[in-house]
Amino acid sequence: MKPYSILWLFPTLLVFAGCADHSSQSNGTNTSTNSIVLDSTASVPLPTNPNHPSKEETPMSIAPGRLLQAVSAEDLNLVQTLSDQSTAMIDEQNEKGESPLLIAVHHNMIDIAKILVDHGANINLQDHIQDSPYLYAGAQGKTEILAYMLENSEPDQSIVNRFGGNALIPAAEKGHLANVKLLLTDGRVDIDHQNHYGYTALIEAVALRDGSKIYQDIVRELLAHGANKELRDNQGKTAEDYARELGYDQLLSQLT
């Protein structure tokens, strides 16, 4: 046998030799051993690299901000993976107070929003300007996300936006007929809620817009679901008063 062919045995032999010598000393003998027994079942722990821990030693965890980043990058697969792994960061907020779900709603990321809702994301959590995923979806015409929230979560109707409005008022004012229908059919929203200016959804649909067909349709939906035509805003005006002042004859005919 060539001399170098047994060099690889030396570390192992030394380990077991040391173990054997230690064992003999612990038994009160000083007998040295000239033989080495290799135990095929013995194992010597290998050093671990702290920069590359094994999955068994350190389970993967979600670092703060990682889910927010995944949503912002529209990385559907990573959002799914992180949400499946842990919901601890499902409602984390960035420097603007935006949650992962609110970011998804902002950009109408329908599939990502559904994943987050399925994993318990809070649809009522507000950012620093008092937008919540539910309120924003209602106000900005994110109809598919709004529908999913209504089916799979519980909107808190006591939470209002920075103008004091609920989801219905801006939906009506911005001409989002599908959202108006959805919210009215769901039935949980207060159809006669008044914001800081005393505006209802009905008043805003008349007073703040152009009286076009889409607003005629919205007014029709509101009236069909029992909107109170007699309510007055902070200036003491009704929706009918505004329709008359602005010359919106089609709306006026609906309101009188």
Regions found by a protein language model. Name each.
Residues 17-18:
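C-terminal motif of bacterial Sec signal peptides marking the signal peptidase cleavage site
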Residues 223, 228-256:
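Leucine-rich solenoid repeat scaffolds
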Residues 78, 111-112, 144-145, 178-179, ...:
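Conserved ankyrin/ankyrin-like repeat signature
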Residues 83-88, 114-122, 147-156, 181-190, ...:
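Ankyrin repeat domain, specifically the short helix-to-loop turn at the C-terminus of the second helix
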Residues 90-93, 123-126, 157-160, 191-194, ...:
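Ankyrin repeat boundary signal
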Residues 21-31:
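Bacterial Sec signal peptide processing site at the extreme N-terminus
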